[in-house]
C-alpha cells in the first residue's frame, strides 16, 4: 500500500498529540495516511499494553487512517541501531511515503528524541540500494525508497516551529482521537496514579497550544513542525 504521509511515534498517542489535526486535514484532502507506533507503551504508569492497543485502534478509526502498525520495540529501551533501523526500513519501503512525520528531536521523554533520530536515520538508509530487505507479507526483495521530507512535530517542550499548518476546523477530531486514550489523559473518576499528562491542565493545553500557534499565523488553530533541512519553494507566491 502506497501512502502519501506516514506518521511515526515512539508511543501510542504521540501521533495523536503531535500532528493528528494535520493528518485529518490531509485525509479530507484525499491523501492516504498511515501511522506506525514504535512501542506499545508498556512502561506507561497508567493502563496496560493491551488497553493501549485497544485505544490506538479506536483512535485510528476516529482519524480515518488507512493503516496502523505497531513495531513492538521495547518501550524505554529501544535503541537506534542496525536491528531497529532495518525493521523500520522494511516499513518505509513497504508504504513508500512521500512525507514522514515523527517525534520531536528533543523532548521530556527519552524515547521521543531516540525515536526521532531512529526514524530520521532509517529514512535516509532506506534509500540506499545496497541495503537488502524483505518484508514477511511481500514477495521478493524490496526496492529502495527515501521519503522526500521528514518533519518533526512538537510535543512536551516548547519548541519554536519552522512552519505551522493551519488546522482550523480539525481540532475536534484531534481531541476525539486523543481522548480515545482513556487510560492516559484526564479522568476525574480514575484511581490510577497521576502522571504529567493525566491532569486537566495538560488536556486543556492541547487546545490552547493549538490556538496560540494559530494566532501566530492569523488563523484559529495551528500545529507546528520543525525541519532537518531547508524547505524549498518554487515561488514566493506559494508561501501563505
Region locations from a protein language model:
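Metal-dependent de-N-acetylase/amidase catalytic core
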Residues: 2-6, 82-240
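Active-site rim/loop-helix segments in enzyme catalytic domains that contact anionic ligands
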Residues: 1-95, 226, 236-238
Amino acid at each position: 500500500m502506497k501512502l502519501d504521509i506516514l506518521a511515526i511515534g515512539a508511543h501510542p498517542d504521540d501521533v495523536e498529540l503531535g500532528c493528528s489535526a494535520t493528518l485529518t486535514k490531509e485525509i479530507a484532502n484525499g491523501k492516504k495516511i498511515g501511522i506506525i507506533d514504535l512501542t506499545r507503551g508498556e512502561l506507561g504508569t497508567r493502563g496496560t499494553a493491551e488497553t493501549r492497543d485497544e485505544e490506538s485502534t479506536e483512535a485510528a478509526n476516529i482519524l480515518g487512517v488507512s493503516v496502523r502498525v505497531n513495531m513492538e520495540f521495547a518501550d524505554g529501551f529501544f535503541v537506534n541501531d542496525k536491528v531497529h533501523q532495518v525493521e523500520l526500513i522494511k516499513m518505509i519501503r513497504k508504504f513508500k511515503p512521500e512525507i514522514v512525520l515523527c517525534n520531536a528531536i528533543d523532548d521530556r521523554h527519552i524515547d521521543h528524541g531516540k525515536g526521532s533520530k531512529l526514524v530520521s536515520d532509517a529514512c535516509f538508509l532506506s534509500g540506499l540500494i545496497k541495503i537488502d530487505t524483505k518484508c514477511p507479507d511481500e514477495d521478493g526483495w524490496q526496492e529502495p525508497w527515501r521519503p522526500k521530507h521528514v518533519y518533526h512535530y512538537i510535543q512536551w517542550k516548547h519548541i519554536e516551529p519552522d512552519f505551522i499548518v493551519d488546522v482550523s476546523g480539525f481540532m475536534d477530531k484531534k481531541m476525539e482521537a486523543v481522548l480515545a486514550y482513556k487510560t492516559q489523559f484526564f479522568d476525574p473518576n480514575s484511581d490510577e496514579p497521576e502522571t504529567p499528562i493525566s491532569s486537566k491542565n495538560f488536556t486543556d493545553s492541547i487546545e490552547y497550544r493549538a490556538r496560540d500557534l494559530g494566532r501566530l499565523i492569523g488563523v484559529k488553530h495551528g500545529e507546528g513542525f520543525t525541519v532537518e533541512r531547508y524547505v524549498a519553494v518554487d515561488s514566493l507566491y506559494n508561501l501563505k
